[in-house]
Amino acid sequence: MTSRVMVLGVGAFAHAVQSILQEDGAETACYLTRPYGHYGPSALGQTWSAEDHPSPLPLFEKFKPDLIIPQAVAWAEQPWAADLVQQGWPIFSPVNDAMRIEISRQESSELCRQYGIPVPAFHHVQNRLEARKIMQDDPRPYVLKNPICSPFSPIHAIICESVADTLGWIERVDYAEGLFLQEYLGKEEAGHFVFISGGEISSLVTNQEFKRAFTGDMGPLAGAPLAGIVEQDPEDKYGLARELIHPLKPWLEKTGYTGPLQVTAIRKNGVWHAIEYNIRLGVTTTALLLRMLKNPLQTLLNVVRNQTTVLEWSPEKNFGCSLTLAGYGYPYVVPSVPKLPVEVSTPLECDLWWNEVDEDSGQLYMANHQNYEMGHRIADVNACAPDMYSAVKLIGNEIRKLRCLASYYRLDLKELADKNLSLFSSVKNNL
């Protein structure tokens, strides 16, 4: 019997997940959670928008999914979330108290301290006066974040590399939901994904994401990475899971944690420090991870059913890279952007996942939403290969086939790969 999968999301994430799982035999549909990024998922089959269907529960009753994959943790904030959990729908996410490890940055950091996991110094304040007091009592460079992890939070991460940077930004941020200050530890950053099911923690991949908008790691942090590198790592070669996830096992068992878990960490003085946990498949990493697995559909079904999972990997896809084509003005506010055509000169020899594009009479255009006056992410181009530099070369060749006026992509993927190799070689030498 064909397994049914419903994705809660939009853009390249929904496009990629549906396409790859369809290739593996699934029937898919998509609940479009945001008012943009509909073209990719809509090209693959049945979709419903949250604007027309405020609750997806009646759609679940109709479609009867075997697996529900959310793009963001924001689903848990919806008025229908409690009913989804109570009714036992197969959501690919931990639920209830297990979600707190991502949702609350302070609780996550305190949990790490409880189990002996290194974390940066941190403070949670409610207003500007409290932030000034922290800088008076404990002056350091801090990364400024919203205390509650949500894509709709008023603050997106601001990395301050000096005390002066921090003093400047605490005067400008929006304190509507408070402010989380996390000590800045440097740039040796990496992430690691695991699946937790059947009482086991199964390592998957180690990744790096590059969120600076421009080549050379310059410009502001974008809302999502502009580039990414992923490596199959079921043996946890760099110790990220061993040091930052496995110590949490008593808490994972206590909360009944089932699903994906990612840790993002920074290495300082030879020690990994946990800076963030995510309870979902990553926007950048998911499509590459699913490509690397020989049987992605059955693997996800085993996890959501809390069964022991045997991972099978494609050796010809040991490494993967992702590169985003960003539209005119991204990531800044740019009013009155016209409907700019997007052209593909010849079919790509790797994956192309559409983000914010619209179709009109067979022609694709960069989205130009009247209420979202920012440059947009047009597409993600992904490539897998047996080695990292082959993936880098392939993706660099293929993204050139895309054209949209004044669009851009990062030109330093090879340099990022060099830094990736240097970092992880150093880590392995010190283990």
Give residue ranges: language-model regions:
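Active-site "cap" helix and flanking loop/linker of ATP-utilizing ligase/carboxylase catalytic domains
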Residues: 241-262, 278-351, 356-359
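C-terminal hydrophobic structural anchor segments
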Residues: 333-392
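Generic C-terminus detector
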Residues: 367, 372-431
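Internal nucleotide-binding/catalytic subdomain
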Residues: 155-282
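A conserved helix-loop-beta module that forms one wall/lid of the active-site cleft
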Residues: 94-157, 326
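ATP-binding N-terminal substructure of ATP-dependent carboxylate-amine bond-forming enzymes
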Residues: 1-95
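Short acidic-hydrophobic, aromatic-tinged amphipathic segments that line or gate anion-handling sites
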Residues: 45-56, 122-127, 158-161
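Short, conserved charged micro-motifs
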Residues: 165-168, 236-238, 331-334, 386-393
